[in-house]
Amino acid sequence: TAFGVEEQQSGNGIHCWKSDSMQIIGNSIRGHRDGIYFEFVTHSVIWRNISQDNIRYGLHFMFSNNDAYYSNVFEGNGAGVAVMFSREVTMENNYFEENWGDGAYGLLLKEISNSSITNNRFTRNTTGIYMEGVSRLQLQKNVFRGNGWAMKIQASCMEVNVQENNFLANTFDVGTNGSLV
């Protein structure tokens, strides 16, 4: 546990770069820039970690493919998790809680494809999931409770399959910036 105050003066709790087959299991990560940071990491698993009170992201994926994160807690971070410029990421049985503020999300997805989000809980976040440039995503059996927005799906997304999710007591359930013609 460390307690960084400013982003530029803090490091990441766990930082993996250009790695394969990593196993990040059973850690408590608190007070860093990003709790867990993956860049160019493949075929890896993040399981049963608690990442909270980090300045930026509880978990941050960049250019990382064929990875999975299961049964983690992301609470009170600048944003819970960001998955960017990645493909074939499995996100299952995680808790995204109390990620509040300007630009704060439970889960931020930017330019990802061929991925799945299943059996997660998004509770009391500014936005549960924000999607931009997402394609071929399966989003099912998740619970969205007490968020400002449960989901924001930008018009740049395509082939997003949303089914069997529960939306409870959110200010808004689903929004987009697109329109049908």
Q: Would you name each region that the model predicts?
A:
Residues 104, 110-114, 119, 129-132, ...:
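Soluble extramembrane regions of membrane proteins in the secretory/endomembrane system
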Residues 1-2, 22-25, 44-47, 67-70, ...:
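All-beta strand scaffolds that present successive hydrophobic residues in beta-strands
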Residues 3-17, 31-37, 53-60, 76-82, ...:
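Extracellular beta-strand/beta-solenoid scaffold signature
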Residues 57, 62, 66-74, 79-94:
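Acidic, glycine-rich loop-and-beta core segments that form the ion-binding/anion-interacting portion
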